Every structure is written in C-alpha cells, then in structure tokens.
Amino acid sequence: KCRRENLDRLIDGMYDEVEEKRDGLIIIGRCNKEALKKLNKKYKSVVSVNRNSTNYEVDEVLCDGKKIAAAAVEYLISLGHKNIGYIGQCHSEDRYNGYLETLKKHDLDVIPEYVIETKQTEAEGYEAMEKFFQSDDMPTGIYCANDISAIGMLKCLNKFRNRYYMPSIISSDDIQEAQFTRPMLTTVSLPKEDMGKFALYLLLDRLKGGHSGIVRMELEGRLMIRNSCSSVEDSMWSDYCI
C-alpha cells in the first residue's frame, strides 16, 4: 500500500491534473504494471523497451529474457557443463526463469547454493564470486544475468588468481566493457540500436493513427563467443590475469 501511494504521488507530482495528454513516452527498462497504467493515461503513446514483457499493457519492443538466458545456458551445456549457477535478480525475472527452464529441459538439477540473487552492480558480482570461493561445492559454469555483475566476478577471479577453480562465465547485454575484460567476456548481445529505432517507430505510428491495438515487437539476441568460457575439463585451470 505504501509503495502504491508513493507511486501515485510521484506520478501525479510530475503532471498537472488538468493538463491534456502529452504526446509520447519511451520507457527503457523495468517498470511495474501500476506505473505503466498511470503513465498510459498521461500520454497518447507509450512504448516499453525491455527484456521482460509488460503482458500487453503498452506497446513494447522486447528482446526476450527467457530466450537470452536459454542461449547462454545452452552454450555452457554444449561445453559439457552440468553444474551451472545463476547470478542476478530472481523475482519476476525472465532471465532467471529461462535459466530454470533450460536446466529442466536437459534434466539438470537446480542447486540452490548455485543461485545467488544480486542487484545489477559490479560490487555485488564481486561478492557473489567470493561466496562461491567460500563454498565446498562450486558450479563449473555460471550464467550471470548482466555484464556489469559478470565484470565484477571476473575482477574477483583475477584478484585471487585461484588456479584450482576457474568457472566458465557467460552473461547478457554486451556492453562495450565486455570486450576489454581479462578474459574477454562471452555474452548474449542485445540489439539495442534496433530496439530504440523500432520503439520510436511504434511511438510515432500510434500518434499518426497507424495502429490502435497493443503491438509487441520481438528482436533476437546474438551469442558473442569470446574467452570467458571453456570446456568443463578446463574449469580447474587458470588463464585469468590482470
């Protein structure tokens, strides 16, 4: 209730009650259903750009989080990994659900100790890697839901240079820094530029009367194979360096 009231005050405070609807709004990233409904009343055209669907609350350009996670986990499995961990958000998160579904598809166990819920920060990725170091049972492959946290994990590995445990790490987003980590980060690239272009197209098309129903446009991610993943047999050897 408190969150809902705070949301009401925040959105109402942004706009005059008697003000006519504004033209358009593009929302990048996660936005809860209540906020979407309120913003949809304030604008003539609202478009969401995200990895998690709005369930047809507004027009959306989507790179499906489940498919992103599936591509990442499938790649780890193709390298022989069976003990696969997850780092990232879990609640209402399509990438986490994609991780779970892909393990189930291959009859692989979901081990609770291999799942560490984190926010999207380098520091929390670093801390997650430290937790694995302290465990007696560690995954050989790890899917990290975002590049930023994965970079934190790689920095932790580089600092300790543990030559007896070097998991394969794969993530998603393909931010610029992913090409300059040591080792270079394997990730699933999102077509960010195209997502932005199509979001603008949908926004303008609705304003011009080109469509009235809710439109969902889905784009595919692309696996970017670099150096942070290797076969399961190599999980105990270190090529990590500062």
Regions found by a protein language model. Give the residues of each.
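N-terminal glycine-rich "phosphate-gripper" loop used for MgATP/nucleotide binding
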Residues: G29-R30, N146
